[in-house]
Amino acid sequence: MMSTHPKPSYRRILLKLSGEALMGDEPFGIDAKVLDRMAQEIKELVELGVQVGLVIGGGNLFRGEGLAKAGMNRVVGDHMGMLATVMNGLAMRDALHRAFVNARLMSAIELTGVCDSYNWAEAISLLKSGRVVIFSAGTGNPFFTTDSAACLRGIEIEAEVVLKGTKVDGVYSDDPVSNPDATLYKHINYDDILEKQLKVMDLAAFTLARDHALPIRVFNMNKPGALRAVIMGEEEGTLISKNAE
């Protein structure tokens, strides 16, 4: 007998969440309600049989630009940013555990007793066994964003797509906040993004994805059900890939 349940379009994904997404309506830090909602949405994916790798930014806890302008060394600022992503990772791991989802937190910098150090083979093995793996501390190197970390880990774990959860519905022709006439792209290729100078990710992250033909889907993480819709192959957000037919 054929199953009537629709199957997910992806088997293994890398989900990138901005630190700001965790703030919700708070001016700073982590909004517990948002954290729990995201944990529930991730739980839905796990229950559908999707293998989930997760990278979270740190902008809700630490922003290096202001301190850099005041003279702080960029490397020091980036190290602080990496630790902010570990704090977000700890919060997310805890939220997932409270939602009865098995999750493991890995860090690109060694933090004995707090979380595991990043190990590629172990990450693959955990994903295969249905655990959510949270990759924190970025790439472990300064001058690289968490978007670069998301693309790097996505390539390493052979994710089929990087899903970038943002505060807007996808990639627009212009800033939708300042220009209400900006149009939302449904499907666009890497070269068009570069040519039109659309802000999706920093160049290092974006070219890494392009060079490895890793598709990126940008969607609104604050829209309930959007993540599931993406996983089920619906036209949610913007798909960036090699060909945009």
From Swiss-Prot:
Record CDD domains: AAK_UMPK-PyrH-Ec (cd04254)
Protein EC: 2.7.4.22
Chief location of this protein within or outside the cell: cytoplasm
Primary gene name: pyrH
Residue positions binding ATP: 16-19, 59, 63, 166, 172, 175
Taxonomic source organism: Idiomarina loihiensis (strain ATCC BAA-735 / DSM 15497 / L2-TR)
InterPro entries from the UniProt entry: AceGlu_kinase-like_sf, Asp/Glu/Uridylate_kinase, Uridylate_kinase, Uridylate_kinase_bac
Regulation (activators, inhibitors): Inhibited by UTP.
MF terms in GO: ATP binding; UMP kinase activity
Single GO cellular component term: cytosol
Protein's GO biological process: 'de novo' CTP biosynthetic process; UDP biosynthetic process
Enzyme class: transferase
Record's keyword annotation contains Metal-binding: no
Similarity annotation: Belongs to the UMP kinase family.
Keyword Cytoplasm (UniProt): yes
Catalytic activity annotation: UMP + ATP = UDP + ADP
Source organism, top-level taxon: Bacteria
Cysteines engaged in disulfide bonds, as pairs: none
One Pfam family named in its UniProt record: AA_kinase
The protein, known as: Uridylate kinase
